[in-house]
């Protein structure tokens, strides 16, 4: 196992930055254009912690977004799977505007007439006793880790300050100090130490490594993504999640499923863990929980875990606010009413089938589930340049880890639009 407190070399980081800088050339917009003005203002007044594709968006509807010059694009990123229901879904917008005009925020110092309704709805939908409402995915991850540690001390009787949480290498769950402490990606952790103690890493999709790690009596939890999204849509072997469930139960260890990106119909099931018919001890949801209209996340588990947390030990000013709760219920209703999991499954099969016909000397790998997919580009073609060309042709996607391009359109995309977007991808790849 690899601990985040071990020494890490700077050489990896330098090599990473050099490679990134060399590959990320930006196609300049027309001089004096409105887009150029937008880029310049952000560059002047904003932190330089992102390297966006050079497009300035001003409108979204369904599977499309428009830039400030009025050009329309297919959105094949979906805000990292936050916009599963499509941009500005009318039902979710209606829920937001109606609740915003009544009551938006109370804090948890008082009850509201919406929170309990939401809590009942979401716990019954996913089959848990309790939910702890938060705002962002990374807050959900932090909450899950706190719950696991608290349970470890109170229920498993781990000695004070000795609890360990195991993570899979190449995970991604955010940018807080806890999240980067669980990362082995230099671009996430370099320069931010010292790191969180009690976090250890094992290989993803490696049952033997997990079995060995869980023998440690001080391990309280194993946190893992059912599919590693940010890594480039890495799908584990069939049966991996069943073994995770089996080993965690055998060793009295909590299984935390990070479904912030994979959950809520994205992979063709309501949850990605549903493919193996298993339930985690702690479930983290976020992103599409609000349909992209408001930051909402949730941590679900049963009473023996959730009731370890007492008043004053965890909370959030905005978590569980009436506006977020109303939006989340509408977003979840859309997933079910429009059968978006079923659509994601069917459209994903078609998308991967068509992508698999692309020349292997350009696209070496096609992988994914539902509408969470990725292609691996031969290094000599440069994935960043491919994305710039896709943009020119009317489709927005973003590379990850150098040679991987994620394809994850909103789940409302139907056959004709999907085929139209596939033609853009084919045209682009064949022109490289």
UniProtKB/Swiss-Prot annotation:
One of its GO terms (molecular function) is ornithine aminotransferase activity. Gene3D superfamilies: Aspartate Aminotransferase, domain 1, Type I PLP-dependent aspartate aminotransferase-like (Major domain). Keywords: Aminotransferase, Mitochondrion, Pyridoxal phosphate, Transferase, Transit peptide. Its EC number is 2.6.1.13. It is an enzyme of class 2 (transferase). Belongs to the class-III pyridoxal-phosphate-dependent aminotransferase family. Homotetramer. This is Ornithine aminotransferase, mitochondrial.
């Amino acid at each position: 196992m690899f601990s985040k407190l071990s020494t890490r070399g700077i050489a990896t980081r330098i090599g990473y930055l050099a490679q990134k800088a060399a590959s990320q050339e930006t196609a300049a917009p027309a001089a004096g254009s409105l887009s150029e003005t937008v880029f310049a203002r952000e560059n002047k007044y904003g932190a330089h912690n992102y390297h966006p594709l050079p497009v300035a968006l001003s409108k979204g509807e369904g599977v499309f977004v428009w830039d400030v010059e009025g050009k329309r694009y297919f959105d094949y990123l979906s805000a990292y799977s936050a916009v599963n229901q499509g941009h500005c879904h009318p039902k979710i917008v209606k829920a937001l505007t109606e609740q915003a005009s009544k009551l938006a925020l109370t804090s948890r110092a008082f009850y509201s007439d919406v929170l309990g309704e939401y809590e009942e709805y979401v716990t019954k939908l996913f089959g848990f006793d309790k939910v702890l409402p938060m705002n962002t995915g990374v807050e959900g991850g932090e909450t899950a880790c706190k719950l696991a540690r608290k349970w470890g001390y109170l229920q498993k009787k781990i000695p004070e300050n000795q609890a360990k949480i195991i993570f899979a290498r190449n995970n991604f769950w955010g940018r807080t100090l806890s999240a980067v402490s669980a990362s082995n990606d230099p671009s996430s952790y370099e320069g931010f130490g010292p790191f969180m103690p009690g976090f250890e890493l094992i290989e993803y999709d490696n049952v033997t490594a997990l079995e060995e790690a869980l023998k440690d009596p001080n391990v309280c939890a194993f946190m893992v993504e059912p599919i590693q999204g940010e890594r480039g849509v890495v799908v584990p072997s069939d049966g991996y999640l069943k073994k995770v469930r089996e080993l965690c139960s055998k060793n009295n260890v909590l299984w935390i499923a990070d479904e912030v990106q994979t959950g809520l119909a994205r992979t063709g099931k309501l949850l990605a863990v549903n493919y193996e018919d298993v339930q985690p001890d702690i479930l983290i949801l976020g992103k599409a929980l609000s349909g992209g209209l408001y930051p909402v996340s949730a941590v679900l588990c049963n009473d023996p875990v959730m009731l370890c947390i007492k008043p004053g030990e965890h909370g959030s000013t905005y978590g569980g606010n009436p506006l977020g709760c109303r939006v989340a219920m509408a977003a979840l209703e859309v997933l079910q009413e429009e059968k978006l999991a079923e659509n994601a499954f069917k459209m994903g099969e078609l998308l991967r089938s068509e992508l698999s016909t692309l020349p292997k000397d350009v696209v070496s790998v096609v992988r994914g589930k539902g509408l969470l997919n990725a292609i691996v580009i031969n290094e000599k073609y440069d994935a960043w340049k491919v994305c710039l060309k896709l943009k020119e042709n009317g489709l927005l996607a973003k590379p990850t880890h150098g040679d991987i391009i994620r394809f994850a359109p909103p789940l409302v995309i139907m056959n004709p639009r999907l085929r139209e977007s596939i033609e853009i991808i084919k045209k682009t790849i064949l022109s490289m």
